[in-house]
């Protein structure tokens, strides 16, 4: 059945900002969808609020709107563009919920827009817990005993009927948000309360606990002729109770019997038919009892999901691409398999290798968060590895996580019986470190029965881990490392570093082991991912390494450039770096064979047809060097680009160069000039530029000396980190003493992992009340091109990755911009940059200070590119390959005159706002972790607001980042520190003029009353122990108060917005309780005066709801006209 001819234009909704449970996989799926639609001659209208995505590049759609995914905005775009159809199944839960809201508001009917990919009814049946339960029953399958609740009273009745433990699952949420396992009434009330709040339909499913059962997933696709294929079965190594996104998962399934698998297939096919997904894909999760084989259907996603991306990368079967074609009316037998180019999509993929996915967590960013893994997803990223067997695949996946001590290690003394007993107790509770603890217990003598009893991980997987330990012990104890033994170690997934440690050689021994391995002729070979277990030839070069006999690499003629990706998403190194890598691949592919190396299954860069060759491999020195050596034999290699993937590839630069690998762009020595504090100080000195007073320290005594010389407050951080990890503002000796030991230990441990010499602790003068600026620029050795000058909305002290910023800057003078331009030129020249550089500055009392410089792609490059209409990373790639800025102006990649530092009257304003994951992280007693922003980055993603002026653009950024955006009326609670009280009267007057009622604590109300400003007084909250947010709460009744504290009012829904600035010492007493309650209630809250002032401007601007909606294609045309007029 050929495609439908009545659909001429399609609107695609993206997934918005990267959040836990919904990450880069939807950029991958959305990009595939846009490419398919355009290939089919269909006009594409794309809406997504996330600028750091490939799908929002202007060439991906005919009209691209970087706008909030909110019903009023979507209606404006629909009214303007008049699409024939809406495709919501490739943008995660955000797009599904947006489509449902448009349907319920009558917008789709009003503008005659058809929903394709899944109907509203199918979405409802798949997402609504009660309706889905009926579908499962009708399919002849079994659900866990369960009931629906919409209130805590109903929840209690269900608990009486079923008993504990109980699983809470909200309707219409993603990543298990608001879900959890309750073992008693207190936990049930806490989890169910959150679940009801986060569900847009105020609905939760309460079901019997099935913890410890085995968990499986099926990815299915169905066309309108009722053809169904099972793309990939996935097995969770962790049993039911840990969210699949937080579990180690494998494909194919290892512990299912053939009969069980066939039964899962039959149930899955019956469910996809029953739900009504007839032009797309879905993901279904099952639980299987380990002894009886009883099967329970857990849930489904009637859309492309995170697991779909994993299944696509694991098999080479492009689920999102095929789902888009199905939505257009094609059938599975009409769609060709791109990889074989000879089989149809109705052929189910077969794999002859093992795929393992390992999650990456960020608990270190959220002190106090409960590290227990539950049904609510907490991981921020994931890595995937392919190999010939499970042991090798697991070892590769664990080292792909790129986190200290995430691979198995046998350092130190063998655990004692007492320690083994402690470890067995610890692994009862699933945490990020469970597998490392489990291996240590095995090393110490724990039996398989003991480990199974503690974890309920299937014995098949445990046996494999026991075998890895057995091999490690053989390596450790052998007199000599024979070729046979070294190969056995490799087949067990052990890296050269792990073997070196087992042999007592430490990190330095990695080179010794590699040289020995090469002497033995023991090198990995590279196999092809072909979807058909080598039944047909693969046309696409998508490779993984393993220790087998024959390589499948093919010779090539063109010179190649190898680009190192950024690995798993994490806080501080996210999708922005994949964006720059993809741009480099796209641009350099015109003249070179591009070779991509990455291990993140969520990303566009790991799409099989994005580069000329794709290596799905860990980003470690060993793995990258082997790829380079293998590619050298296949054809000429110009070099490796390490500048685009963030800190991970950058940390390999020096060792790769020392091993004879040519590094393109900025050299490792030049990178060191910017990152080594002493060397960078010399660069600034020559350029006659100011830096905050600073010192370095390798001991507490040195740190004290430096802090006293500089003067408090100081900013303390380890060297060579990304995302401000370990960074803190310190106000006195006591705080410094507490910080130093931990920070020093982290810095030294990191240097061991990255192969660097021990690096010092950096101590800077903290610039209070300064304006912070980010500058992204290109430099070719002679000419500078400013990509963008971004002014932070918050004052200095908030990490640039968490700060809101505006481009063009809103308060900088022409003279200040000139000084920024001259300073950036001097730094780029002094550091011998070739390619991208990011410099962070601060203006304090009109004195310009340089905070730091990074000679690499920064996380603001995508934002600056979208705001200025210039693909900076594409130009950077060509400069790294030896071309000049003048060449890029000539070929049209850069503006013929001027650059992104020029401000044109009438230019649209872009505001970047960060999205923070605080609602995901709770303390052991259920409170959210504190949201105070500081110098350590904690955001997972970003959005962009785009409009005619700063107030409108800022309002859009808030609407995109937070459900509902900013209120235009209602009640505002204000509590500010003593320093901020002098700015309070003007703010309060503005609030009154805008029609808000003010609520305040006694001290703040007293200040306001002196200026004749009325406010309602609320009781103050304080905790007995200032630093302990879990301490019991005492309430102090203030004179004239309403008899309630602000937390009571927030919980009663009587507060609409909060300004709560902490005192300078970061006291967490009152502020913590207020901020935690506000997170639970999803209220807009501000912890800096400057951002609250911006919010007031925004509220004033949007009271009339007159947003300007402009596509980025229209924006680029407008910019070009303004530039032409000016020059």
Curated annotation (Swiss-Prot):
Mn(2+) 1 binds at residues 285, 299. Transmembrane segments: none annotated. Gene3D superfamilies: 3.40.50.20, ATP-grasp fold, A domain, ATP-grasp fold, B domain, Carbamoyl-phosphate synthetase, large subunit oligomerisation domain, Methylglyoxal synthase-like domain. Mg(2+) 1 binds at residues 285, 299. Its EC number is 6.3.4.16, 6.3.5.5. Composed of two chains; the small (or glutamine) chain promotes the hydrolysis of glutamine to ammonia, which is used by the large (or ammonia) chain to synthesize carbamoyl phosphate. Tetramer of heterodimers (alpha,beta)4. SUPFAM superfamilies: Carbamoyl phosphate synthetase, large subunit connection domain (SSF48108), Glutathione synthetase ATP-binding domain-like (SSF56059), Methylglyoxal synthase-like (SSF52335), PreATP-grasp domain (SSF52440). The keyword Nucleotide-binding applies. CDD domains: MGS_CPS_II. One of its GO terms (biological process) is 'de novo' UMP biosynthetic process. This is Carbamoyl phosphate synthase large chain. It comes from Bifidobacterium longum subsp. infantis (strain ATCC 15697 / DSM 20088 / JCM 1222 / NCTC 11817 / S12). ATP 1 binds at residues 129, 169, 175-176, 208, 210, 215, 241-243, 285, 299. Residues 133-328, 681-881 form the ATP-grasp domain. Large subunit of the glutamine-dependent carbamoyl phosphate synthetase (CPSase). CPSase catalyzes the formation of carbamoyl phosphate from the ammonia moiety of glutamine, carbonate, and phosphate donated by ATP, constituting the first step of 2 biosynthetic pathways, one leading to arginine and/or urea and the other to pyrimidine nucleotides. Its cofactor is Mg(2+); Mn(2+). Mg(2+) 4 binds at residues 852, 854. Residues 963-1127 are annotated as: Allosteric domain.
């Amino acid at each position: 059945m050929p495609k439908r001819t009545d659909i001429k234009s399609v609107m695609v909704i993206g997934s918005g900002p990267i959040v836990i449970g919904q990450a880069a996989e939807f950029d991958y799926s959305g990009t595939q969808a846009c490419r398919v639609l355009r290939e089919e001659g269909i006009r594409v209208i794309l809406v997504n609020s996330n600028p750091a995505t490939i799908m929002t590049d202007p060439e991906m759609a005919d009209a691209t709107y970087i706008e909030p995914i909110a019903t009023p905005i979507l209606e404006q775009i629909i009214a303007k563009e008049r699409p024939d159809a809406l495709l919501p199944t490739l943008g995660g839960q955000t797009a599904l919920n947006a489509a449902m809201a448009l349907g319920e508001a009558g917008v789709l009917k009003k503008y005659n827009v058809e929903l394709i990919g899944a109907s509203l009814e199918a979405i409802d049946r798949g997402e609504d817990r009660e309706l889905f339960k009926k579908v499962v029953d009708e399919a002849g399958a079994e659900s866990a005993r369960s009931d629906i609740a919409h209130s805590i009273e109903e929840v209690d009745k269900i608990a009486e009927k079923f008993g504990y433990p109980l699983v809470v699952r909200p309707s219409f949420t993603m990543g298990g948000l608001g879900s959890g396992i309750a073992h008693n009434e207190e936990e049930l009330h806490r989890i169910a309360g959150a679940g009801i709040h986060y569900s847009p339909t105020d609905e939760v499913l309460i079901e019997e606990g099935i913890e410890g059962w085995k968990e499986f997933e099926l990815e299915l696709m169905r066309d309108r002729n009722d053809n169904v294929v099972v793309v990939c079965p996935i097995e969770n190594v962790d049993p039911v109770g840990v969210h699949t996104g937080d579990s180690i998962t494998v494909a194919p399934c290892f512990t299912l019997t053939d009969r069980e698998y066939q039964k899962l297939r039959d149930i899955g096919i019956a469910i996809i038919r029953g739900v009504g997904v007839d032009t797309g894909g879905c993901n279904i999760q099952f639980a299987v009892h380990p002894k009886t084989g009883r099967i329970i259907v857990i849930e489904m996603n009637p859309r492309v999901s995170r697991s779909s991306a994993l299944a696509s990368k694991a098999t080479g079967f492009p689920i999102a691409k095929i789902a888009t074609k199905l939505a257009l009316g094609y059938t599975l037998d009409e769609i060709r398999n791109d990889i074989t180019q000879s089989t149809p999509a109705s052929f189910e993929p077969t794999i002859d290798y093992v795929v393992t996915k390992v999650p990456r967590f960020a608990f270190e960013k959220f002190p106090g968060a409960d590290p227990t893994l539950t049904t609510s997803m907490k991981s921020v990223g994931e890595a995937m590895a392919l190999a010939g067997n499970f042991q090798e695949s697991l070892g590769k996946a664990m080292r792909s996580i790129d986190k200290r001590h995430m691979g198995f290690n046998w350092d130190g003394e063998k655990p004692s019986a007492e320690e083994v007993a402690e470890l067995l107790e610890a692994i009862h509770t699933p945490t990020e470190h469970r597998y490392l603890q489990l291996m240590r217990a095995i090393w110490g003598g724990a039996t398989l029965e003991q480990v199974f009893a503690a974890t309920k991980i299937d014995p098949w997987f445990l046996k494999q881990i026991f075998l890895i330990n057995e091999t490690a012990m053989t390596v450790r104890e052998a007199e000599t490392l024979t070729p046979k033994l070294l190969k056995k170690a490799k087949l067990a997934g052990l890296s050269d570093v792990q073997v070196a440690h087992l042999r007592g050689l430490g990190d330095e021994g990695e080179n010794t082991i590699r040289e020995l391995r090469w002497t033995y002729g023991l090198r990995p070979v590279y196999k092809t991912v072909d979807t058909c277990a080598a039944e047909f030839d693969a046309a696409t070069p998508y490779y993984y390494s393993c220790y087998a006999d024959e390589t499948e690499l093919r010779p090539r003629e063109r010179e190649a450039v190898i680009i190192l990706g950024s690995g798993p998403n994490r806080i501080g190194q996210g999708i922005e770096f994949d964006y720059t890598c993809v741009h480099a691949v796209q641009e350099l592919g015109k003249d070179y064979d591009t070779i991509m190396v990455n291990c993140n299954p969520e990303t566009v860069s790991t799409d099989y047809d994005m580069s000329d060759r794709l290596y799905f491999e860990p980003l470690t020195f060993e793995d990258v060097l082997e790829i380079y050596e293998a590619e050298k034999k296949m054809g000429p290699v110009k070099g490796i680009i390490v500048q685009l993937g963030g800190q991970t590839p950058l940390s390999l630069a020096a060792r790769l160069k020392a091993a004879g690998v040519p590094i393109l762009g900025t050299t490792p020595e030049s990178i060191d000039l910017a990152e080594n504090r002493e060397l960078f100080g010399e660069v600034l000195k020559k350029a006659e530029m100011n830096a905050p007073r600073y010192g370095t320290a390798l001991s507490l005594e040195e740190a004290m000396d430096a802090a006293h010389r500089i003067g408090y407050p100081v900013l303390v951080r380890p060297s060579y980190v990304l995302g401000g990890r370990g960074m803190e503002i310190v106000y006195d000796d006591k705080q410094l003493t507490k910080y130093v030991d931990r920070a020093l230990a982290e810095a030294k441990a990191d240097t061991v992992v990255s192969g660097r010499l021990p690096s010092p602790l950096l101590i800077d003068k903290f610039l209070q009340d300064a304006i912070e600026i980010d500058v992204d620029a290109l430099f070719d050795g002679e000419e500078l091109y400013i990509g963008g000058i971004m002014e932070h909305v918050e004052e200095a002290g908030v990490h640039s990755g968490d700060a809101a910023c505006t481009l063009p800057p809103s308060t900088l003078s022409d003279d200040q911009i000139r000084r920024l331009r001259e300073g950036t030129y001097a730094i780029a020249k002094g550091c011998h940059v070739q390619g991208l550089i990011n410099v962070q500055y601060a203006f304090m009392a009109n004195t310009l200070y340089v905070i730091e410089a990074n000679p690499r792609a920064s996380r603001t490059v995508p934002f600056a590119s979208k705001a200025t209409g210039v693909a900076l990373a594409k130009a950077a790639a060509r400069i790294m390959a030896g071309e000049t800025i003048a060449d890029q102006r000539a070929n049209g990649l850069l503006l013929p005159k001027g650059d992104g530092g020029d401000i044109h009257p009438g230019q649209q304003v872009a505001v970047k706002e960060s999205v923070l994951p605080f609602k995901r992280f709770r303390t052991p007693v259920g409170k959210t972790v504190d949201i105070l922003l500081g110098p350590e980055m904690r955001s997972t993603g970003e959005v962009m607001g785009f409009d005619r002026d700063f107030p409108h653009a800022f309002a859009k950024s808030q609407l995109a980042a937070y459900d509902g955006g900013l209120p235009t009326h209602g009640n505002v609670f204000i509590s500010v520190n003593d320093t901020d009280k002098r700015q309070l009267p003007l703010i309060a007057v503005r609030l009154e003029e805008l029609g808000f009622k003010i609520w305040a604590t006694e001290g703040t109300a007293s200040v306001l009353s002196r200026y004749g400003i009325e406010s309602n007084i609320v009781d103050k909250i304080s905790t007995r122990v200032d630093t302990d947010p879990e301490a019991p709460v005492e309430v102090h009744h203030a004179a004239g108060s309403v008899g309630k504290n602000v937390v009571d009012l927030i919980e009663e829904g009587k507060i609409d917005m909060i300004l709560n600035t902490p005192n300078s010492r970061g006291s967490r007493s009152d502020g913590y309780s207020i901020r935690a309650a506000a997170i639970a209630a999803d209220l807009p809250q501000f912890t800096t005066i400057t951002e609250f002032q911006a919010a007031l401007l925004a509220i004033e601007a949007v009271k009339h709801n007159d947003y300007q909606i402009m596509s980025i294609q229209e924006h680029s045309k407008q910019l070009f006209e303004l530039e032409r007029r000016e020059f």
